[in-house]
Amino acid sequence: MSTSRDRVRQALSHQGSDRIPVDFGATAVTGIHCRVVEALRKHYGLSYKPVKIVDTFQMLGEVDRDLADAMGVDCIGVGGTRDIFDHDTECMHEQVTPWGQKVLVPIQLDLTQDKEGDVYVYAGGDKNISFLILS
């Protein structure tokens, strides 16, 4: 049985392995929405905790080690210390999304919902620069 590292290296070298390497959540392309991450944790019987948002533009949740192990994931993400909106991802706080889910987001992040139900986020916490993230 190959290790995750072996599987990925063999795939990148176009060699066979015991199975195709699996990636859920290591990049913005393979990420999983925070609602789905919470549902997967419940499905696999993992302890409840607010999902850490790793991509605030797409609201992608962190696939942490216990969930990755449960799903047989081979790849792990290597994130930076700032998100796409220039928020510090080292300092997080709990916030409730407009759909009622508790998540961990950068402390500068302020999800604002307007009267039509659209949700906005602000670059670097600057209320003059807004981005629509949910309509």
Q: Predicted regions: what is each one?
A:
Residues M1-S135:
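Catalytic cores of TIM-barrel enzymes
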